[in-house]
Each structure stands twice: as C-alpha cells, then as structure tokens.
Amino acid sequence: IQAALDANDSSETDRLVLKITPGDYREKITVTKPGVTFANADVTAKRAVTIRASYYSSNTFDADGKFVPQDEFDLGTNKCATVTIGAGATGFSAYGITFQNDYNVVDHTAAGEQTPAVALNTQADKVYLKNSRIIGRQDTLYVQGAGNRVYVDGGYIEGTVDFVFGDANAYFAGTELHMAAFAGKNNGYFTAANTKKSGVGLVFDRCNLTVAAAYDDDAKLSLGRPWQTFAQYTQVRKGDGSSYVTGVDLGTKNSAYTDTSSAVTYLDSTMSSKITKNRWNVWTSKNQSGKSVDVTFHDDVRFAEYASHDETGALLDPADYKNVVLGSMSALDEAQVQAKRAELLAALGFGSAAGQWVVPDGAWPFAYDPNYSTGTDVQPTQPGGNASPNADSAAMPETGSAIIAVVVVAVPLLVAGLALVAVRRNRQQ
C-alpha cells in the first residue's frame, strides 16, 4: 500500500482511490498527499482489509525527561501508529478498512504489558472514515491537530485506556466504542481529549458504548478523563526517568497547558450499565508514596452527556447519578436532541456554508462488484513480518497475497510486486 501511495500523485480535486482486495497487509503506512482514499474492494466489507503492524511507546524517559526507546519497535506515541494520516493529507477517506496495532492485541498481552500503541493517527483536516474498524488497546485512535475535522461514519473502535484521544474536532455518528479486556486490568477510559479552548472536541452521537464480559461489577470504567487540562503541580524526576508529584495547586492552571480545555460530548448514545456512576475521571499522577493525586484543573474541563440511554433503550435519569465527576448529565426530549445535534455539527464546521466542510455522503467510491462480495473471509497464506521482540511467533497474524487496484484511467501498473490499476475520481461535492 505504501508503494502504491509513493508511486501516484493526488490532490483534493484529483483523488487517488486505492481499491484494496480483502486480506492482511502487514506494513506501517504514512499518507502524506491530499485526496487519498483507501477502499475495501468488497463493498459489503464482509471480507476484511486489515492493515496491521506492531509498534508501541514504552513511555521510558531519562533523568532529563528525554524519551529513551527500548528497542526498534518503541517509537513513542506520536510515531508508533500503524497508519498515520500526515498533516498534508487533507481529505483522506477510508471505506471498510480495518486499522490495527497488534501490540497488546496479538502479542505482548500478558498482565503488566499494556502500553500506548496507536492503530490510526490522523493529523490532517477533513478526514472521513466510513464503516471502518480501528483496533488497539491503549491509545487506539489519535485524532491530532487543533482545528482539524474528522468524521467517523459508523464503524467500530476498540481499546482499553484513552482509546479515542487528541485535540482535533471529531464527530462519531453511530459508531460502536468497545471497551476490551486486558489481563490484570479492571479499569478503563473511553476517551482522553486535550482539546484547545477554541475547539469543540470529541462528539459521540447515537453511538453504542459496549464493555467486554470479562469486566465484573466492580470495574472502574469511565467515559473519559481530561488529558493535559492540568492544574499547576511540582514533581521530581528520578535518575531512572520516572517522576512523582510533590505538590499541586488545584486553583491554578498549569502554565505549560494554558490553552488546553478537554471537551467530550455524548449525545443520544447507548451506555453499558458497567460504566461508572461517576461517569468521568479526573487525571491523576502518583506522589512519592505511590498514591494517586488529582492534577486536573477542573474549571477548564468540558464534559457533557445528553439523552443517554441504557441497553434496553430506556433514557437514563440524571437524578440517579448524584456524584458525576467533572461533567454534566442532562435529559433532553427529541426536539432538544435535534437542536443540540445541529448546534454541534455547525460548531464542528460541518455543512455547506462558507468555510464549512461538506462531508462525503457515505457512498462507496466505486460500483458494487459481486466478485468481491461472495464467499468466506480471506485466509492468509504467507508468514507475516514485523513481529515485536519476544512475541509469540505462533500467535502472529499472517499476510495474504492480496491485490491493490488503484482506482489513472485503467492503466495497469506494477508496484512492489502488486498488480495495480489506477483510476481517478474527482472530489465529492
């Protein structure tokens, strides 16, 4: 896939559509050009196109606070994503694609091994994802870049800790957010926004928040916590790079993050009964004795929940939730829900007015082909690469011999041994 990207130019008005045959693609990909589309050749998406790799962040630092990689796969949170949509890749879209980071999902799954491992990092404006799956554990989907707009249309996102995070303005319509289980863990956070004060943040509309059966009734699962909306605190960094908090002034904003104001909104969404009654969590750090200390600047946190309902469809009554942490919980009637939805979409910059983004209509970028819509899932045929150090090789997924069709006028190309047919499509208006 990376070779196909490198061999073809594109723009927002002369799009490059990669029509990808179902199968596993084990590679780390960076999209740098505007107007690129990844599309599953099976329009029904019953057979998966899975892009997978296994890189991570150990969050290891030296005494000066400099990141210290532990091996060649330890790239840090900003660089470990399986697929990165770079800042110049305006207008990227994906249809029926699975983005997966195998770290902590397929390999390194033992208790104590959970660590950030991003599956998809979007750094561009006007990113559109249709019926796609994003799979990881901690830090699965990173929507990055203040003012950037991301629209997630349906699909599925899976993780355990902060698995939708970042400072972009992102709207999720009818998406399932699944809290996966991890060995030795009985807690998790759906989101970790570090929205700027001018941003709207993460908006989840008519979404379904589900939780793995492995979590018991004592699980501490929250809708999110406020990344970088910190109060002023002091800390000591030890020789091994670890640090601990020595003091916190909750009434003063942290001078390093004066413009951060974490914002997350849930609207008309279905909530698992296993989500905490407190709904949200503060951000904490450890003190010298190992106790968690609240370091959140509460006044700048913008968490809201509107018209949530349980698995049966019954509306949740805010009166039953007396100790909501940080955010607000409101009951709305249908007219109020519609008004709030319109308000949020306009604030996010979606629409047809000047300066707004006309979001794609969701139609697949090419016609239905029954040849890609029958039979069972593609079976991998060749051993995969990029196994993480100490990974169980027997558990590593394999790579199928799949074909990419690049949707320039039916001209066959050959890139990196893959048959390519390029077709251009103008930008959707």
Say what each PLM segment does:
Residues I1-V378:
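Sequence-level preference for short, compositionally simple segments enriched
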Residues S373-S401:
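C-terminal low-complexity, Ser/Thr- and acidic/Pro-rich disordered "stalk" regions positioned immediately N-terminal
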Residues V408-Q429:
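C-terminal membrane-anchoring or membrane-association module
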Residues A402-V408:
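Alpha-helical transmembrane segments of integral membrane proteins
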